Amino acid sequence: MTNIRKTHPLTKILNNTFIDLPTPSNISSWWNFGSLLGLCLIMQILTGLFLAMHYTPDTSTAFSSVAHICRDVNYGWFIRYLHANGASMFFICLYAHIGRGLYYGSYMFQETWNIGVLLLLTVMATAFVGYVLPWGQMSFWGATVITNLLSAIPYIGTTLVEWIWGGFSVDKATLTRFFAFHFILPFIITALAAVHLLFLHETGSNNPTGIPSNMDMIPFHPYYTIKDILGALFLILTLLALTLFAPDLLGDPDNYTPANPLSTPAHIKPEWYFLFAYAILRSIPNKLGGVLALLLSILILIFIPMLQTSKQRSMMFRPFSQLLFWTLIADLLTLTWIGGQPVEHPYIIVGQLASILYFFLILVLMPTVSLIENKLLKW
């Protein structure tokens, strides 16, 4: 008798996705981040659901409702900090996942890659609207500054900003709609993640060498289920350590002050995971130019497959490309640091140089070095 796992319409889908899925035999721990992102998403939806049971999306009570969650709700403080730090873990996994894709040439699966870029944008939007909800100083001013960037769009900009705000400033209507967006977007992310997996399983996974994977495949279960569980344990351990020992390490102290439209914080800055893009935005003195650079810093990922000039898919055997890749990572870390600094000398010039280097590396240096490496293959 055939196993019900392989015949029942529902279990058949799960079986072909998580159990009998043919997987390359040599994928490293860098391939763990996909499942970790799934775990992060589930944790964020669950903790968010419990927070939403006690939160009130109203300007007069939002801040105190978060304080109420932390003080009066059973384990409310724990759920709140799991959710806040869970977002940080989400972005760490997300950036590692994208970095792995860049390093090993996974972007050559173009449909999977493009859905991935769309997922990144959706997660960033979710994190942004979520940061506004506690209605602290940084929530309010972050929302004001970032939504105001849309006013740089010629002709329709100001109208668009007021339409998003639901008034002439960030107020009650803005908070209510941001809560609605923050609630619905994770479910859209879940649907997109399913499509992401669908496209991935059409081609099968890439592997560190970059050569076709169908030479040597093994079933996903038990080999990679056990490996993913190990990764998940590391993730949960890190998240718990962060939540229980240093819950405010990655947050901003200004957000413990209730939102006040009459008092601007000394340094308005987003959460750490947006700082690299914020630094690129600030490095251009022109408003529209800055907004375009900000958009391009993320959307440049869509053009990566078109910039592939190497005959080899992976960087595993390309030392010069490896050097440039790690230079790019160092540059992104520099931008992250600059994004958190005040706008003064020497941070301004460092930010401008790091921004130029970011685009120059991706658009010029990496494709050129790949062509040189192609020549070296013939030696």
Curated annotation (Swiss-Prot):
- Manner of cofactor binding, per the entry note: Binds 2 heme b groups non-covalently.
- What is the membrane topology here? Multi-pass membrane protein
> Where is it mostly found?
mitochondrion
What molecular function does GO assign, one term?
ubiquinol-cytochrome-c reductase activity
Provide the binding site for heme b b562. 83, 182
Sorted alphabetically, which Gene3D superfamilies does this protein's record hold? Cytochrome Bc1 Complex, Chain C
Q: Where in the cell is it found?
A: Mitochondrion inner membrane
Q: Which stretches are transmembrane?
A: 33-53, 77-98, 113-133, 178-198, 226-246, 288-308, 320-340, 347-367
One GO cellular component this record assigns the protein to is:
respiratory chain complex III
Record: residues binding heme b b566: 97, 196
Record keywords: Repeat included? Answer: no
Tell me any Pfam family this protein matches: Cytochrom_B_C
Q: Name one GO biological process term.
A: mitochondrial electron transport, ubiquinol to cytochrome c
Keyword terms of this UniProt record: Electron transport, Heme, Iron, Membrane, Metal-binding, Mitochondrion, Mitochondrion inner membrane, Respiratory chain, Transmembrane, Transmembrane helix, Transport, Ubiquinone
Q: Where does a ubiquinone bind?
A: 201
UniProt cofactor(s): heme b
Please describe the quaternary structure of this protein: The cytochrome bc1 complex contains 11 subunits: 3 respiratory subunits (MT-CYB, CYC1 and UQCRFS1), 2 core proteins (UQCRC1 and UQCRC2) and 6 low-molecular weight proteins (UQCRH/QCR6, UQCRB/QCR7, UQCRQ/QCR8, UQCR10/QCR9, UQCR11/QCR10 and a cleavage product of UQCRFS1). This cytochrome bc1 complex then forms a dimer.
Q: What does this protein do?
A: Component of the ubiquinol-cytochrome c reductase complex (complex III or cytochrome b-c1 complex) that is part of the mitochondrial respiratory chain. The b-c1 complex mediates electron transfer from ubiquinol to cytochrome c. Contributes to the generation of a proton gradient across the mitochondrial membrane that is then used for ATP synthesis.
Q: Name the family the entry cites.
A: Belongs to the cytochrome b family.
Other facts noted in the record for this chain: Heme 1 (or BL or b562) is low-potential and absorbs at about 562 nm, and heme 2 (or BH or b566) is high-potential and absorbs at about 566 nm.
- What's the name of the protein? Cytochrome b
* Organism field: Cephalorhynchus eutropia (Chilean dolphin)
Q: What is the lineage of its organism?
A: Eukaryota, Metazoa, Chordata, Craniata, Vertebrata
